[in-house]
Amino acid sequence: MSEPVSTPEHRIPIRRALVSVYDKTDLEDLVRGLHDAGVELVSTGGSAKLIEGLGLPVTKVEDLTGFPECLDGRVKTLHPRVHAGILADRRLDSHVQQLADLGVEPFDLVVSNLYPFRETVASGATPDECVEQIDIGGPSMVRAAAKNHPSVAIVTSPERYADVLAAVAAGGFTLEQRKVLAAEAFTHTAAYDVAVAGWFASTYVPAEDGWPEFAGETWQKAAVLRYGENPHQDAALYTDSSGGGGLAGAEQLHGKEMSYNNYVDTDAARRAAYDFDEPAVAIIKHANPCGIAVGADVAEAHRRAHECDPVSAFGGVIAVNRPVSVEMARQVADVFTEVIVAPSYDEGAVEILQGKKNIRILRCADPAEERSTELRQISGGVLVQVRDHVDATGDDPSTWTLAAGEPASAEVLADLAFAWTACRAAKSNAILLAKDGASVGIGMGQVNRVDSCRLAVSRAGDRAAGSVAASDAFFPFEDGPQILIDAGVTAIVQPGGSVRDELTVEAAKAAGVTMYFTGTRHFFH
């Protein structure tokens, strides 16, 4: 028997449609349009009730199959008279003949979307309630229609309803259009199955090590970017199953389109700014901080963050953990800035910033609901870890161990706590000098801690005297702390834990410098 052949045009007129949806957005417009075009409607459950309520003729599936919906709606469309009508390949004479012999009418269009499983899980529902929202008949219909796209059009999104009515008027979808719809349908069911499988693996198969045996995620293309990290690299933005929340779902209020590097730097900036409870501003370039500060308000925090390294801040990315005030907007408008991101903007602030033609202004909700784990791809796999936050036991100054010198005053301890928190935003090896709630010198990304100390002191200049220092990991030798001490640093906070801690402690004691151990490390790569 020869293989069935379809031409690219190959329109199939839409005369009979099976409609069974959970999300009834714009369904009324769709079914009215189908009815007006003379399309026979077959439907189930709530969809059929809606159609009947509009006074439109509809054949209920139970009347089609001769078998009632049962088990609280768990069984509706799982019947040969339904699936044969969906799966028959009408390019094959044998299939057409079998339908005739069985008395089954084929469907030209299937419109279906699925129970809200992911949303039910997110609502905090019980396991039984979640299981009840696992759709069975819906995915079966969707997959059947998608498989048989040479003969059937499958629509899974209300956003396609206008296309459906246009296709009806044009004599049906073309084969190429049906292929696109089928791809969307399989994407729809694949994402659904990944969500169900992931939930089952994490809920019903507890792992002794705390990590499920299966972890899955799906991403949807949100934008094609001009290029990647460099102009010769193609790039795109995809959103995860959270529905486009977080930075990926930020609202852009002004400016050129976001670039790959803009996203990387903005993500790092938000990470730094939201580590603080007080009004805070972080200025980032190449994913490293040019300056971080807290203040009585965001304008003060921005001034002080900018003062840390004004040269590097030129062309940087700014993140704020509070609404941007008019005063801060005026300050930002005086400096070339690539991106500013904030939860909101006071009246008049956006208009001031819009005076800079190319600045990208983003509004992005607080990251409180963002995921607790993060991924990093490696060759052949992916690394998954719990996201690092400043919430470990050792991040609380009340738990620190005084290793050298006198206990810090309340003011110095507050600066140490600030420096410790801010240091987490710098790439390892990281040393951060701070004074009065603002960074004054940052050394980061060096392959030895001594060079990071030198870099931090060099950038701080005269401001190093009287400042405090934080190190994201322990000092392996006393040479790093000695550089800080010689520059006039009065107190140091570090994790401790080196086999040579006593040498570091002795150097601090000899200089009368206070040193605390946190017992917590904050590497950042």
Swiss-Prot record:
Chain coiled-coil ranges: none
Keyword Hydrolase belongs to the record: yes
Pathway(s) served: Purine metabolism; IMP biosynthesis via de novo pathway; 5-formamido-1-(5-phospho-D-ribosyl)imidazole-4-carboxamide from 5-amino-1-(5-phospho-D-ribosyl)imidazole-4-carboxamide (10-formyl THF route): step 1/1; Purine metabolism; IMP biosynthesis via de novo pathway; IMP from 5-formamido-1-(5-phospho-D-ribosyl)imidazole-4-carboxamide: step 1/1
PROSITE patterns linked to this entry:
MGS
Respond yes or no to whether keyword Transmembrane is given for this record.
Answer: no
MGS-like domain span: 10-156
Q: Name one GO molecular function term.
A: phosphoribosylaminoimidazolecarboxamide formyltransferase activity
One GO cellular component this record assigns the protein to is: cytosol
Q: Which reaction does it catalyse?
A: (6R)-10-formyltetrahydrofolate + 5-amino-1-(5-phospho-beta-D-ribosyl)imidazole-4-carboxamide = 5-formamido-1-(5-phospho-D-ribosyl)imidazole-4-carboxamide + (6S)-5,6,7,8-tetrahydrofolate; IMP + H2O = 5-formamido-1-(5-phospho-D-ribosyl)imidazole-4-carboxamide
Write down the EC number: 2.1.2.3, 3.5.4.10
One Pfam family hit: AICARFT_IMPCHas
Q: What InterPro entries is this protein classified in?
A: AICAR_Tfase_dup_dom_sf, Cytidine_deaminase-like, MGS-like_dom, MGS-like_dom_sf, PurH-like
GO biological process entries: 'de novo' IMP biosynthetic process
Keywords, comma-separated and alphabetical: Hydrolase, Multifunctional enzyme, Purine biosynthesis, Transferase
Question: What family classification does the UniProt entry report for this protein?
Answer: Belongs to the PurH family.
Domain comment in the entry: The IMP cyclohydrolase activity resides in the N-terminal region.
Name-wise, this protein is Bifunctional purine biosynthesis protein PurH
UniProt organism field:
Nocardioides sp. (strain ATCC BAA-499 / JS614)
